[in-house]
Structures are given as structure tokens and as C-alpha cells.
Amino acid sequence: LAKLERLCAAADILGCAFIRGFAFFAPEEGPLPAETLAPYFERPVRLLEQRGKTLLLEADPSVNTSNHAALARLVEAIGSPRVRAIFDPGNCLYDPLGETPYPDGYEAIRPFFAHVHIKDAVRAVPESYCVKVGTGQVGYPALLRRLAADGYAGWLSMETHYRLDSHLTEEQMRLPGGAGFSAGGAAATAESVAALKDILQKE
């Protein structure tokens, strides 16, 4: 709760209404269900109400909501307008349950998301990996058309876990940070931003 308070203070300084978060790392025995997790958000919701901020939860394979269907169940169980979701279609391709980014992931989280992350990836064994936007399995042309058709007017936030000449490790993806994570990020981001602009212009 103290960390959320600090994040609210930082958001005030930056003029941000949204704060990104996750539904806690999943225990080794498996993810907790929405009805177990929801009570843990009662005090954070009260703080968010006091500070006028909205917490946007993200689906991620390392947390209790590994996909957008699970995340939608949690947001619905919390039942507060101060807790919404991020739609991150690239994370679907790391989901151990195999959620499809579009249409399945999108349809599941559509009533709840207020922000979109952009990255592309390929589902693979033993480990999925990120690629330049538009060259993976997200299917961005169809997804972007759907976002436009549904009237989405929020941000598209580039989340570059792709690198030109290497792949980030699972641990780097789980806990990003440091020089090793950042190395090569600028060039890969520039390439993916150009690719996204190209897709948007064509669509």
C-alpha cells in the first residue's frame, strides 16, 4: 500500500491518471482465482478513490492473471471503476493456457481495458520470443481495425521486448531492468515504431 501511495504521488507530479500494476506473482502451485484475489484490492481501491487515480492491471504469465480472460474475471470481481485493465496482445503469446491475442483476448477484456500495449511475439517451444511489430502472431492489422471500429481513443504504448540481434531471457522479461535489459532497445524500438506507423497508414 505504501508503494501505491508513492506511485500516486509520482503520478501527481507527472500529471498521470493511470497507474500500471499486476495481480501479484502466482504461487508455485498455480494461480489464485479471482474470488480469492479480489479482497486484496479493497484497501488499494480506497486509496485510489482518495487520490483520484485508476489502477490498470496487466495480464502476464508470471502473475495470477496469465491471460485476459482471467484478468477480466478479476476486474469484474473487484467491481470498482478505479481498477481497469491494460490490453497487451503480445503477452497472450506467452500465456501457458494459449490464449489467442485476437479475437479471444480482445473480446475477453474489451469491457474493461483503458490502455493498449504494443509488442509482437511468436509462440514457440521451449520459449516464446518477441519480434518486430507486424511480423509475429498478434495479427495487428485486424486488431487495429477493430480498435478503430470500436472507437478506442486511448494510447498505443510501445513495449519493446524485441531486440534486433538477440532475445531477452525469461527472467529479463519477468523482472525488466538494468543495462542488460536495455541494451539494443533503442534500435529495436525505432524499427517497431516505424513498422506500427506503416501498418496504421495502410489500415
List PLM regions with ranges.
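Histidine-acidic metal/acid-base catalytic patches
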Residues: A9, G15, H68-E203
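Active-site acidic/histidine proton-transfer and metal-coordination neighborhood
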Residues: L1-F87, A179, A183-A186
